Amino acid sequence: MQTFHHQDTGSEDFRQNTMDEKWADDDEFSTPQITQNADGTKTIVTHRMDDGKKYKRSVTIKNQSVTEKVLNCVAERSKWTKYGKELGAPPGPNRMTTTIGEDIVFVLGLKSDQPEEEVEEEEAAAAAPRVGEDKGVKCRLCQGPHFTSKCPYKETLGGSTAAGGMGRSLGGDEPAGAAKTGGYVPPHLRNKGPGGPGGPGGAAGGRSDDDDELTLRVTNLSEEATDDDLRRMFGKYGMINRVYVAKDRDTGRPRGFAFVTYTLKSHAQAALEAMDGHGFDNLIMKVDYSKKRN
């Protein structure tokens, strides 16, 4: 009896030891080992069994704080209390109730009642620092160092002289009386009279010389260039009217050249001088005025 009891006890001890080893293995695999490193990172080590093989996985994690700078007005709006279905929601748009659209570039147009001479002077003043030209300002009425629109003698000297200047700026051959009653004429509508480029006897298709003077042709352009890339590079020299990147009809890939049209000739000239020979995406761009099609 004692011998049988002794064998029984040994069998129970063996089973108990085997179960303890399995529990230890399960505890080792289920509990990840987390170590805090001296450089601020954290290492997590885990183990797993797959097809009788033991695998060890080590992951290093580094926490970084990213500071985002926003305008003061945006920060103030984020503190507003939400209402309705969004009452109590955290700051920022909720994807469940708010749809975020694409960014739209909003360009303010010219005022219809603003004289052309004031428009050109304001745009020239805005473009001068970008172009880097050191030219003085001279009044067309009293020859003083100020803009014509700011002339203190405008009421006295701005009669027939201003009317004649308006007629010359429009580039027409009409009498002075017609120039007095006319308002601002956009560049694409100028010289539309008889003999002008857009009228009878002018250039075919209503195309004027101003189109070529305002449009730049960009060649040796990267195939990865987009309209946004050109607007970003050429937009700092003046207001852009349109950008066209030529693409292949079959593949849709850019063909290596594009056209950029400005609203003022001075802006186009400044962009030509600055961007001709400029590097973009490992290529040297060639910039020149667009040529007419025969």
Curated annotation (Swiss-Prot):
Composition-biased stretches (Gly residues): 193-205
Alphabetical list of SUPFAM superfamilies matching this protein: RNA-binding domain, RBD
HAMAP family documented for this protein: eIF3g
Assembly with partners or alone: Component of the eukaryotic translation initiation factor 3 (eIF-3) complex.
Keyword Transmembrane helix belongs to the record: no
Main location: cytoplasm
A Pfam family reported for this protein in Swiss-Prot or TrEMBL: eIF3g
Protein name (database record): Eukaryotic translation initiation factor 3 subunit G
Cellular localization per UniProt: Cytoplasm
Species in which this protein is naturally found: Yarrowia lipolytica (strain CLIB 122 / E 150) (Yeast)
Biased composition annotated in UniProt, kind: Polar residues: 30-42
A Gene Ontology term for the protein's cellular component: eukaryotic translation initiation factor 3 complex, eIF3m
Similarity comment: Belongs to the eIF-3 subunit G family.
BP GO terms, sorted: formation of cytoplasmic translation initiation complex; translation reinitiation; translational termination
Superkingdom: Eukaryota
PANTHER family named among the record's database cross-references: EUKARYOTIC TRANSLATION INITIATION FACTOR 3 SUBUNIT G
Keyword Transferase annotated: no
UniProtKB keywords: Cytoplasm, Initiation factor, Protein biosynthesis, RNA-binding
Cross-referenced CDD domains: eIF3G, RRM_eIF3G_like
Residue ranges annotated for the RRM domain, each copy included: 214-292
Function in brief: RNA-binding component of the eukaryotic translation initiation factor 3 (eIF-3) complex, which is involved in protein synthesis of a specialized repertoire of mRNAs and, together with other initiation factors, stimulates binding of mRNA and methionyl-tRNAi to the 40S ribosome. The eIF-3 complex specifically targets and initiates translation of a subset of mRNAs involved in cell proliferation. This subunit can bind 18S rRNA.
Gene Ontology terms, MF aspect: RNA binding; translation initiation factor activity
Region (Disordered): 1-42, 164-211
Biased composition (Basic and acidic residues): 1-22
